[in-house]
């Protein structure tokens, strides 16, 4: 009789444990469904936010192009690309360049109207892209241009304002630039 009670006890425990596990699994499924729904909503909001930013950038692009593209192009016409090691450093010369890079790297070049700083002659915006790679693999940097033709590195950012694996290498190369290196095609 003692053996029978022990068997019944084990069977009861197993059934209780199984019922408990079934409840836990139900709760996990509910939790997972909630998490997945939350993620889907977040993705949709991110997508809508991104579309809105792109729409605003395109609208700004149209408005600015109508007003003063020539002024920006006049300021940037003497600045050309520079090739150093495995990188190509290229200035953003048009409003379209600013919009494209801003959208591609998901950074605030258009929203904060960096092209105005370039038009004023206060700074120059360049991309640093490894040879054979796309803009997303590179970084964007701002060079402050002083009246005596000295330059200094400002911001240096990659995709979504984060540094790339080449961040330090690019930074060190840019610090060696002189104003003369940026006028016309040159190799540092």
Feature locations, PLM:
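Catalytic-core elements of nucleic-acid end-processing and repair enzymes
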Residues: 1-188
């Amino acid at each position: 009789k003692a053996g029978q009670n022990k068997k019944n006890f084990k069977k009861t425990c197993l059934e209780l444990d199984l019922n408990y596990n079934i409840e836990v699994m139900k709760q996990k499924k509910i939790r997972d469904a909630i998490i997945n729904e939350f993620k889907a909503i977040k993705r949709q909001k991110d997508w809508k936010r991104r579309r809105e930013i792109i729409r605003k950038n395109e609208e700004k692009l149209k408005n600015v192009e109508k007003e003063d593209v020539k002024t920006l192009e006049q300021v940037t016409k003497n600045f050309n690309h520079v090739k150093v090691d495995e990188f190509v450093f290229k200035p953003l010369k048009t409003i379209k360049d600013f919009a494209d890079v801003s959208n591609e790297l998901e950074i605030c070049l258009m929203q904060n109207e960096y092209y105005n700083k370039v038009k004023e002659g206060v700074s120059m915006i360049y991309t640093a892209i490894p040879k054979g790679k796309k803009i997303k693999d590179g970084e964007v940097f701002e060079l402050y241009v002083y009246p005596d033709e000295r330059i200094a590195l400002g911001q240096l950012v990659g995709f979504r304002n984060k540094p790339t694996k080449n961040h330090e290498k690019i930074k060190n190369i840019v610090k060696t630039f002189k104003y003369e290196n940026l006028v016309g095609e040159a190799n540092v």
